[in-house]
Amino acid sequence: MTVERAKLYFMCGKMAAGKSTHARDLARTKNAVIFVQDEILSALYPGEIRDIDDFVKYSARVRVALSHHIKELLSRGVSVVLDFPGNTRAQRQWFRGLFEGAGVEHELQYIDARNDLCKRQLRQRSEVLPAGSPWTTDAEFDVITAYFEAPTEDERFNVIRHERA
C-alpha cells in the first residue's frame, strides 16, 4: 500500500466556473480537510460584505488567521483543499507561502471555463440566493473577471487544468 504525502490543493478559475464543486469533490476523493472561504466569511462577517473592498478586507483577515493552522495541518501529514480564489498572481503567492512553509507538494487546480458558461452557472446559482446578494449579475461577473489572470509557466506551480465546455 502506498501512503500519499500531505499536499496542498488550491483553486483558480473565473467566478462560477465550478471551483467550489471541484474543491468539495477533491477533498472527498483525497480524504483532505477543506476550508471554504465563502463559508468562513459568512460565519465571521454576516451581512458585512457588500462590495469588492469589503471582500478584499475581510478575506485578507481570514488568510492571516488561517495561515499558521493550514501550515500546521500540512506539516503533520494532513492534505488540505483550499476553496479560496487563486485568480491573480498576487493571490497565488499566499498559497506558495503555505506549501513552501510546510515543505509539502501542491496542485493548482485550474478550472478553465468560457465566460458564457460561467455566466449561465452564475444565473442558476443566483436563483436560490436572497435578493441583494453580492456577485450575482452578469455585470458583476464582468467587473470581477477583468482582474482574472490565468496561471502561467513562469509562476512554477504544478497546474492541473480542467477544461469545462
Which residues fall in each region the model found?
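Flexible, glycine- and charge-enriched loops at secondary-structure boundaries
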Residues: 52-60, 85-88, 134, 138
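Conserved substrate/cofactor phosphate-moiety recognition/catalytic segment
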Residues: 17, 21-78, 124
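P-loop (Walker A) phosphate-binding loop of NTP-binding proteins
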Residues: 14
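ATP-dependent NMP and nucleoside kinases share a basic, alpha-helical "lid"
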Residues: 43, 48-49, 74, 86-127
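Hydrophobic anchor at the beta1->P-loop junction of P-loop NTPases
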Residues: 11
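Amphipathic alpha-helical transducer elements in NTP-driven molecular machines
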Residues: 56-63, 67, 112, 138-145
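Conserved GTP-binding G-domain of TRAFAC-class P-loop NTPases and closely related GTPase folds
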Residues: 2-8, 25, 29, 33, ...
